[in-house]
Amino acid sequence: MSKIVKVIGREIIDSRGNPTVEAEVHLEGGFVGMAAAPSGASTGSREALELRDGDKSRYMGKGVLKAVGAVNGPIAQAVLGKDAKDQAGIDKIMIDLDGTENKSNFGANAILAVSLATAKAAAASKGQALFEHIAELNGTPGKYSMPVPMMNIINGGEHADNNVDIQEFMIQPVGAKSLKEAVRMGSEVFHNLAKVLKAKGMNTAVGDEGGYAPNLGSNAEALAVIAEAVKAAGYELGTDITLAMDCAASEFYKDGKYVLAGEGNKAFTSEEFTHFLEDLTKQYPIVSIEDGLDESDWDGFAYQTKVLGDKIQLVGDDLFVTNTKILKEGIDKGIVNSILIKFNQIGSLTETLAAIKMAKDAGYTAVISHRSGETEDATIADLAVGTAAGQIKTGSMSRSDRVAKYNQLIRIEEALGEKAPYNGRKEIKGQ
């Protein structure tokens, strides 16, 4: 009953108004799975390739008709008649047929959309929720947890048009007793932050991920206004709510230095920027820092891990690009202590699950993440619960492309009850 009988690819629109790939996988018995590939703004150089058409007469060259053509043509032909429950087998067929190291023939956007749609169709054929099926694929059936959210409430860097260098300033409601309560706490801080910014005469327009993008005088000022909002919402900073940052440092790495516009265009060495971050962690309860240096600055990361690695969570995103080969090298060298998981960086569900497992086996944490270009597809919510990853990063408390994931988590928590605990601070490395 889980044999693939039809595969359909189409071009749809993401949250930035750019095209992306959506796939449908149809099985015998009428079961259907549908999924869409997300898209990033600040991308690691070693990510699997997102195939764009380059035809300037359509969508400024960002069309995905080539990738859609791959779904409707060679991919569909290769997987027809195959068992959708054999996720690893389906993914291997597509990867082998593509034949490139970085999926540049069909595009990771094509392969991923079919990979996720296959998982959804297989879950439907088994009468399961997607998170249940993912837990089985992961070799951890029935083992679930609700993730602690990292809520990106102030956007800077590539995600906003302002003078803040650090790309994301996030809150983590570690003191919540449930995911539902964590969402409420996040929402209340988000709305209080709007009041704080308005009172200072600042802009409350939102960036790509639904957070505010005010023109602040410095990076530290972003932390200060969030601290004010947490207090105004009636919560205690450091106890109820902790802070996290995504530096996306590759975006301001120039000629071997970290050049920060928000700090008067000061140029920092790797060591100096590490101590700049360390100073911020002493002033504010920052428990997680992502991409604190450039993706190629491995010596710098070794130093940063030595200085901060036993105190806080250091997350590799552009550094590892959800790639087990690169992650293994990082683990062997003791670089950072956590990985950000974005399944479009690697391009299939099977490879994503392998990266999560490798990280956990090495004592690293795994943070499941959206991209800045998203759709209503909420698969990452099921991925976070089904792998018991422990943390999720899916934007702020606005924009339906972000909220879709929180709402799916609320539904899953309701369905699972005590089978999926919300573990709060314990999920964060170093806490």
From Swiss-Prot:
Swiss-Prot/TrEMBL catalytic activity: (2R)-2-phosphoglycerate = phosphoenolpyruvate + H2O
Binding of (2R)-2-phosphoglycerate, residues: 167, 342, 371-372, 393
Quaternary structure note: Component of the RNA degradosome, a multiprotein complex involved in RNA processing and mRNA degradation.
Positions contributing to Mg(2+) binding: 246, 290, 317
Localization per record: Cytoplasm; Secreted; Cell surface
Active site annotation, chain numbering: 209 (proton donor), 342 (proton acceptor)
Enzyme class label: lyase
InterPro entries reported in the protein's UniProt record: Enolase, Enolase-like_C_sf, Enolase-like_N, Enolase_C, Enolase_CS, Enolase_N
Chief place where the protein resides: cytoplasm
Family: Belongs to the enolase family.
One Gene Ontology MF term: magnesium ion binding
Cofactor(s) needed for function: Mg(2+)
Record note on cofactor: Binds a second Mg(2+) ion via substrate during catalysis.
GO biological process, one term: glycolytic process
EC number: 4.2.1.11
Annotated protein name in UniProt: Enolase
Keyword Membrane on entry: no
GO cellular-component term (any): phosphopyruvate hydratase complex
Recorded metabolic or biological pathway in which this protein acts: Carbohydrate degradation; glycolysis; pyruvate from D-glyceraldehyde 3-phosphate: step 4/5
UniProt keyword annotations, A-Z: Cytoplasm, Glycolysis, Lyase, Magnesium, Metal-binding, Secreted
Role summary: Catalyzes the reversible conversion of 2-phosphoglycerate (2-PG) into phosphoenolpyruvate (PEP). It is essential for the degradation of carbohydrates via glycolysis.
